[in-house]
Amino acid sequence: MGSQSLKLPFDALTRTLLAWWGIVPYPISCARAKQIRRHPTIYLYERRILIFMTSQERHEARYQRRKAKRQARKQARCNALGPMEKIFSYRKMFFYGKKCCNGVRWKQSVQNFEGHLFSGTANRRRKVLDQNWKPMKCTHFTLCERGKVRPIDAPHITDRQIHKALCNEVLTPLYGPCMIHDNGASQKGKGLHWHFRRLKEQLHWHYRRYGREGAVLLLDLKGFFPNAPHALLYQRHQELILNPNLRALADTVIQNSPCPTPGRGLPLGVEPSQQEMVALPSAIDNWIKCQAGVHCFGHYMDDYYLIFPDVEALKKLGHEVV
């Protein structure tokens, strides 16, 4: 088919489509060419036109595009939450106030709270929207669980209402996409028995491929809650909670948490502390899953397990994780 039937210009054999559209500054001849070589095109990089890009510049451009996409996804998740008035609506806060009473209605303080729930919810909602809310002092007691003594700090039931709204409407939707599937603590639809079944599936997967070869590495983070650095929590709030009012509220919960060491530690028994600490090691979890490529791996609060067919490689991986 000739150039006349396609209504092409008379010099179509000596011009490429890029030069035809004016993308390259000079025509490139393709006549009698067995292989068309790739020629540099114009790129817009940091507000300047480039004909040639080095390898470092291409890597940087790809990184900036990936970074922009990640930031856009974070912004979309924050926009999906809505404004403060929607997140802490009267209907939602009243619903979470009712949930705070489940199982503890025999307490006098809970009965007083539920009896004044209509007016109390409106009062606390106004304080949250005006950024005047401050949590009350927690009740401290010790609990012996399977032979281990744990210090518990129970918040007042009026604060629990706000904690539940903050966790379910803000922290869980924003922290969830950053966590791996095999992180099963304090999440809806998961839990201890779910993790038992997940571990059983992973053991079956390993045995079908490697038999009895390999080993299991168990890790325990000592002083997980008492040693939680507040700086990392504030940094994660800055990265994921893009609404300044919501970020200030989440920072207030951390700042007023009872901890013996300034700038370090979160209390057991406070629901936002559970959500913060469940998502805190997400960077390590994603590194083990994605970078190290460990399929049989799980994380339940401060307990880790890794199943690997090569014992020596598993030891080396354990040192890298630590």
Model-derived features with residue positions:
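Reverse-transcriptase-like RNA-dependent polymerase core
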Residues: R124-K148, N245-P258
